[in-house]
Structure formats: C-alpha cells, structure tokens
Design a protein with these regions (language model features):
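Intrinsically disordered, low-complexity, mixed-charge
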Residues: 37-234, 238-245
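Glycine-rich phosphate-binding/hydrolytic loop that grips phosphoryl groups
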Residues: 559-572, 579-585, 591, 632-641, ...
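Active-site-adjacent structural elements in enzyme catalytic cores
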Residues: 146-458, 465-529, 533-548
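Conserved phosphate/anionic-ligand binding catalytic regions in large, soluble enzymes, centered on
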Residues: 278-292, 383-394, 587-596, 670-691, ...
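Glycine-rich phosphate-binding loop of actin/hexokinase-like ATP-binding domains
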Residues: 426-452, 579-641, 663-711
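Low-acidity, Ser/Thr- and Arg-rich intrinsically disordered low-complexity segments
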Residues: 2-8, 12-28, 32, 36-39
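A contiguous, well-structured pocket-lining segment that forms one wall/lid of small-molecule binding clefts
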Residues: 234, 241-243, 478-516, 638-778, ...
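Conserved phosphate-binding/catalytic loops in two-lobed NTP-binding clefts
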Residues: 531, 549-562, 779-784, 789-791, ...
C-alpha cells in the first residue's frame, strides 16, 4: 500500500498526468460550440479530408460522436436534420456513442455540420468527435437509424434521469391528450435514463422497459422521425406501459386505466389528509410521504423511521407554492424547475403552514418540485418526501424489499412494476451549491483536463471520452456520503450518491454500483485508491479489490483528496502551473500523524503531487472517541481544557456532575483521548458552550446537528440585523481561537454569540489563507470539506478573503463534503501514475 503524505511523497511534475487530449482524429468540441471555434473546425476538416469522393459534387463523411448522446434524442435529431438537408446515410448507437455516415452535396453537409453542434437536444452533450471523408456509395435513398452495434469499447456516456420537460407537462394536464394524467409520461427530452439502463448501447431491449412491448400507437410514435418520441426508449402509455398498484392491510389493487389511476390517487390523498404515511415507488427509488402541514403525521414518521431531528425535505406542487414556504432567489426558482430538479435548501419563510417538525432547531430546509407523472398525481399540497430506507441503509428500489423493510413505517404503498436497475436518490443543493450529487447530475462525468478558466460546469473543449495514454483509476471514496469514481481517459465518472457505508446493505449497494459502472465503461482499473483511514469499509474494499485484480493500492490522505477535488473540478491542475492554497474544513479525516484532522490549510503544487500542511486549527482532545463526536458537551470540556479557557461559567451545567468528573479525569491522564484539529468538532464544542439547547448532556441524533443549529442561530441574528454581514474583521493578523470563544461567550444572547463565533472563525481562517497564499506566491485560494456546506460561514469567509483582493474558489460541480472525495482520490491516482510507477 502506498500512501500520499505531504511534501516528500510525490514530487514529480504533472506532465503526462492530466490528459493532453490527443485521441480525437480531427477535433474535439464542447456542446454548443461558439461560431469561431466551429469555423476553425470546418477548416480543419476540409484541410484534413482525404479519400475517395473528394473533388466530386457528392461527398460522404463518417462521423464518430462521443458524449451524452444516447437516451437523449440525439439519433432522431441527426436523422431529422439530415433529411431536412436532403442527405442520405444512416446513424446508430454503439458502446462508443453514435456513429454517422452521411452523403450529399458539400453545401448540405456543411449545413448538417453546423446544426449538429449548435442545435443539440436539450439533454445532449458532445464531448468528442472525429470526422473523415470516405468513398461515396451512391445507392441509398434516405437517411435511416440503424440497429445498434456492439464494439465493447465503453466510451458512451450514461445519461442522467431528468424531470419532465415542458411539453410532457402540458400533455399530462391536457384532457384531450392520450397521455393525460399518465404516471409514466416521458419523451426523448426527459424522464428515466440511468435508473432503467441495464447495458449499453442504450436501446429499449437493454432497459427495464424491455418488459413492456409497445402498443401500435406508441410504436407509430417511436418510428416517426417527426415525433418527439422518435426512438424514445421509455415510451409507453396506459395501454402498454408499467402498472401502478396499491398495497395496504386490506389487500392489493392494480391500476391500469386512467380512471383506476385516479381512484388510486384519490385514495392516497384521503389517507394523507388523515395523517397516514405512504411509501411511494418513484423513478430511482422509494419515498416515504406524509402531509407536511400535519404535526401528528410528521411526528409519526419521525418515530417510526427513528429519525427524531434530522430535517425532512418538502415537495411543493409548484414554484409559486414553494416560494410561499421558503425564501427563494430567482436563480433558485429556475434551478428548482430545471431538468435536474434538485432539492434546494433555502431559508424558511417567517410564517407558513408547515409543521415545525419539518426541521426542528433549524431555519432552513429542503424544497423540491414534482419531477415525474407519479409525483404530479400525488402532490396537490406540500408533502414531506424523504428517502424510503431504514436508517443507515441505501434507498429501497425493489417492491418486495420495500414491503419488508418499510412495512412497519408506511400505512400503505404505491408500487409499480417497472424495475429500478440503478438506485438514484434526489440531488441536494444549498442554494445553488452542491451538497449531494445524484439525480439529474450523476453520472455526467467531470473533465479532468486543465484549462485557463476558473468556472466550469462540466466537460468542455479539448476533452475526450477516452485516452489510451492514461491509466484507469478506481477511487473508492470515503465512509460517509459515499461516492466512488473511475478516472477513464480525460474524464472522471463520479457515481451517484450511495450514502454511509456502515451497513452491510450499503456495502452491497456499493459493490453493485461499482460493477455496473466498470461494466458500462468497459474499464479495467490499473490502480485503486482509498482513504488513509485503516478502518473504513471503503479501505477494506480497496484492499480486497487490489488483491483480487493484482493491482497496486494507493492510500490518500483525506484532506489532500478534498483539496484536489476542488482544483480538479475547476480544472486548475496543469503542467507548469504554480501553487494553490486550500482550506480543508470538516468533521474528521485521518491525519498522516495518526491524529484527527479537519481544520487545515494546505499548500499544493498545481503541477505535481507535492503538498504540505501549512497551518491547522489548534488541537484539543476527543474524550471517549466516537462518544465525544455524538456528545458536544464532551467536546466542549476537551476544548476548554486544552485551550486553557479556565472559566467555570463556560462549563457549568454541561452535563451531570458524575459524567463531567469522569471526563475531567480522562483529560488529566490522557487515557481514552485522541487529538483533533477539526473545525467541525470546534463548531460542535461551541454549540455546547453557546446554545442552551446543548447544555445538560444531550446527544446529537444526526451528523453535524449541533453545528447546523449553531449556524441557524447565527443566521437568525443576521436576518434581524442586516448590517451584520457588512462588517469585515479589522484585525491585521489572525487572532487566537481562544479569543474567538471568549468574545462569543461575552455576547448578550445566544443568537448574537453564534454570529460572533462564525465571524471570528471566518476571520481567523481567512487571514491564514491569505498569509499562506502570500508565502506561496499565488492567488489561487479555495475551500473544501464538509464545513463548506455552512452557507453563512462561506459567505463570511468569502467577504474576508475578497477584502484582501482574492477570489475564493468554492465547489460548483461535486460536493465539498465526502461526496466529492472520490474525485480528489482519482486525481491523486493520476498524479502517482505520472511519477513513473509501473501500473
């Protein structure tokens, strides 16, 4: 096992590591290429064209298109524009993407070329393309879509599941349309993709829709090039599609016709009005649902699911309804109603109809909109819509499994008979910043080629779907909020959210997802990368995988991976680049010294794997290991002891006298303690010191609960004191963390104390970042780690850094927490490969 440690571990340059994009025969384009780039491409193609057919009035071109071009209406789009231009030939799917052969006059071919890259279907993305002139055939009479080919190269990209498009929504509510109120309505521009694909290339027989033969009207649409459902693989209707069914203590009823479906949902609405809990099978998994305005229903859900405090997501019927429940910016409204349709965490409205049990102790919660026909039928008022799973396990996807596991929670079930092949949970964003990347986003790959720009949302120019010059890397991710990643060619394929790895069910789901993505990519890893922590389930998996496949294993320090994930998504890693400074702030990460890190400033080379820990938060002891993490008062005792905050008022009534005495004795001897520099744990300790809620020995019931409640208290202060955000620290040097605590404790009330603490922390971290950046001679400064989910802390930190003339880089594509860790691990693997190790 190799481990990546600071400075001396990896010092070779980045050359030969990040891809130089040489695999494309002629050119590489991003979706919606600008006209100047397109003209350059046309000249390149004309200059490089060879072979029979040149110099004649009729030419034939063979195109290879790679990217998200399967399951998004790309072949029908090509056929339509080719026929419109009077061209003949064919196109089809294979494991690489889409192949096209087209024949006709040069002017018509030029028109096709222009439209091919500027008028793409809504969900399509071209990552790479090549073109060559070949011999004309002369006998074709039309342009056709041909059956898929099997080449087993694994270059086609999997499309994500997306929300209903505007056209399907209009049809859904149109009483004259055959699909009026049809639960499974979709077209080439929307609906399930990843969740139903069993293998590539993407055709109906290779999806879970294969179990539903098309009726004559659906087949007519499917084969009509002018129809929006031309080659739409999920196409179905009341006559031929999946069927809903109702299950409760009274028995089972199947709903086939529109009338039966309406009766089923009337029954569901009646139960919800009475405070019942429903388990509903959606597109990518099950949801547990109840009336969001009903205290008794919300309390029942929390009790049965054993989720006493963790915030619940709410589904609102419309954007306007959502805006009555939470405060939304115009950008957030558009995001909610986008094809990705994520859950958006936003501040609560000051008054509203929702139960206070939605997000106890917090001032914000997640809001979402209906994104499928099933949800449109169900959601006629605000509903709690939370993952249908047992605590600590992945979301249920199988009917029998759900009936077994959720039977003690739900009063009734709405099921359907379309198999969910790949679980896909809802994505979560804090405003427009990623917190959980899943439905609508995964597995859209992340480009890991360098660029001069610092703002990217996905693969861009100069990327290819595969390069033979780079080793394939499998990164197993972290223990919490797990994703894994496969670096394959120029792209990193980060999986959909899997979740916490503590249960056997989660580990089995992880194994299935790994097998599926490796198979879809036709990828054979040459190196496996894991976290440095020896006790993670993902570390054990990586060890077994490396042994079974006889490949080398690399263990990467947690916070180095966080920092790399930020730089990689901004595509700032490149040969001859300078250095970067990244604050990695979270709850826990196994340090190279055996202690628990989580409040670090790292200085990294952007052209090699060299890094160093420039600064860290002052350490203090965790007393009792994991028990300390769940009991903020224990953290507070350890912090005040180590930081010499000798004030009896600070620690008064933290817990009962017996427990406090026991912890103090452990602090005196050091027995049963471990040192930490974690900012997340400092926030937990501060919550116990500043919020009455956390005095008295209470334990958190979900990760980061005390920290989130501290943020909520500080945010309430900001909402009632708008001028508070305008102030920036006047200190020219970082103040000691002890002074931050003292100043916060001296505040007149808990909300102001929480805000003062946030401001003090932001000031200290910002000064350390700027200081490290000056020493490194760089203006590339960023932040990663789970604490970056604290929106108030990030805004204060951004303002502090901006006051020094520096723009703070934050995550835009992958989550700053452990959901983005696998991307950083994969990039670390590429760095190691660049040192010349034989992989």
């Amino acid at each position: 096992v190799r481990t990546v440690r600071p400075s001396a571990a990896l010092v070779t340059t980045f050359a030969n590591c990040m891809l130089n994009a040489t695999s494309c025969t002629i050119s590489k384009l991003a979706v919606r290429t600008d006209p100047s780039r397109l003209r350059k491409v046309e000249c390149m193609e004309k200059a490089g064209a060879t072979g029979a057919g040149m110099g004649t009035s009729i030419q034939r071109i063979r195109w290879r298109i790679e990217g998200i071009v399967q399951g998004v209406g790309f072949r029908p789009f090509v056929a339509t524009i080719a026929r419109r231009a009077g061209l003949v030939g064919f196109c089809g799917n294979d494991e690489q993407g889409v192949f096209i052969e087209v024949e006709g006059p040069p002017d018509a071919l030029a028109a096709l070329r222009s439209q091919l890259f500027t008028e793409l279907p809504a969900l399509a993305r071209i990552i790479n393309h090549s073109a060559e002139h070949i011999a004309t055939l002369g006998h074709e009479r039309e342009f056709t879509i041909v059956p898929s080919r099997h080449s087993y190269s694994g270059r086609a990209l999997l499309p994500p599941d997306t929300a209903l498009c505007p056209d399907c929504r209009r049809e859904f509510f149109d009483p004259t349309n055959p699909r009026y109120l049809y639960p499974f309505i979709s077209c080439t521009n929307c609906g399930p993709r990843l969740s139903i694909i069993t293998e590539l290339p993407y055709d109906r027989p290779r999806t879970t829709m294969a179990a539903f033969p098309m009726c004559t009207p659906c087949e007519r649409e499917y084969t009509d090039p002018t129809d929006r459902r031309y080659h739409a693989q999920p196409i179905s209707c009341f006559d031929c599609g999946p069927r809903l069914s109702w299950h409760d203590a009274g028995g089972t009823a199947t709903a086939t016709s529109r009338e039966e479906v309406l009766a089923l949902f009337r029954r569901a609405h009646a139960l919800l009005d009475d405070g019942a809990l429903l388990a509903v099978k959606g597109i990518g998994g099950f949801h547990l649902v109840c009336d969001a305005t009903n205290d008794a229903a919300c309390e029942k859900l929390r009790m049965r699911k054993r989720r006493p405090d963790k915030p619940l997501a709410v589904m609102a019927p419309t954007v306007d309804t959502a805006a009555q429940l939470v405060e939304l910016t115009e950008q957030e409204k558009r995001f909610l109603d986008s094809p990705e349709a994520p859950i958006v965490i936003a501040p609560k409205q000051r008054s509203g109809p929702l139960s206070n049990l939605i997000a106890p102790g917090l001032d914000s919660f997640g809001i979402m909109l209906p994104y499928s026909g099933i949800h449109l039928l169900l959601c006629d008022c605000p509903l709690v819509v939370t993952s249908g799973n047992l605590s600590g396990e992945p979301v249920c996807t199988d009917n029998a499994d759900a009936l077994k596991k959720l039977g003690h929670i739900a009063d009734a079930f709405i099921l359907h008979d379309r198999e969910i092949h790949v679980p896909v949970e809802d994505s979560v964003f804090i405003g427009t910043a990623p917190s959980r990347r899943s439905r609508g986003f995964a597995p859209v790959p992340v480009s890991i080629t360098p660029t001069d720009s610092r703002s990217h949302t996905g693969p861009g120019p100069g990327t290819s779907a595969r390069s033979t010059s780079q080793p394939t890397i499998f990164a197993t991710g972290g223990e919490l909020k797990n994703t894994f990643a496969i670096a394959h060619g120029d792209l990193a394929h980060v999986s959909a959210h899997i979740g916490d790895m503590g249960s056997w069910a989660s580990q089995k789901a992880f194994q299935r997802a790994v097998d599926q993505l490796l198979s879809m990519r036709d990828a054979t890893p040459e190196l496996v990368v894991c976290d440095l922590h020896p006790d993670y389930a993902t570390t054990a998996f990586a060890e077994r995988f490396a042994a079974e496949h006889d490949i080398e294993l690399l263990a990467v320090q947690h916070h180095f991976a966080h920092a790399l994930s930020l730089l990689a998504e901004h595509r700032l890693l490149s040969p001859n680049a300078g250095r970067a400074v990244v604050a990695t702030l979270d709850g826990t990460g196994y340090g190279t010294d055996g202690s628990i890190w989580g409040g670090e400033v790292l200085t990294l080379s952007r052209s090699s794997a060299n890094w160093e820990r420039t600064w860290h938060c002052p350490t203090f002891p965790l007393v009792g290991g994991d028990r300390a993490v769940t009991h903020p008062w224990r953290l507070a005792l350890g912090l005040t002891h180590a930081w010499e905050l000798h004030d009896d008022h600070l620690v008064r009534n933290l817990s009962n006298e017996r427990e406090v005495a026991l912890v103090k004795s452990q602090l005196a001897t050091g027995v049963g303690t471990v040192q930490t520099s974690s900012l997340g744990r400092i926030f937990d300790a501060a919550a116990a010191l500043l919020l009455p809620r956390w005095r008295g020995g209470g334990a958190i019931s979900y990760e980061a609960q005390a920290t989130m409640e501290l943020e909520a208290a500080a945010t309430r202060y900001v909402r009632s004191h708008a001028e508070a955000l305008g102030a920036v620290s006047s200190e020219t040097k970082p103040v000691p963390f002890q002074d931050v605590i003292r100043e916060a404790v001296a505040s007149p009330d808990a909300e102001q104390a929480a805000f003062v603490f946030h401001g003090g922390v932001a000031g200290v971290v910002a000064k350390r970042l700027v200081q490290a950046a000056e020493e490194a001679g760089t203006d590339v400064v960023g932040v990663s780690g789970g604490c970056a989910n604290n929106a108030l802390l990030m805004e204060l930190l951004r303002r502090e850094v901006a006051a020094e003339g520096i723009t703070l880089l934050q995550h835009q594509i992958v989550p700053p927490g452990d959901g983005g860790l696998s991307l950083g691990q994969a990039v670390a693997g590429r760095l190691l490969a660049a040192t010349g190790m034989d992989v």
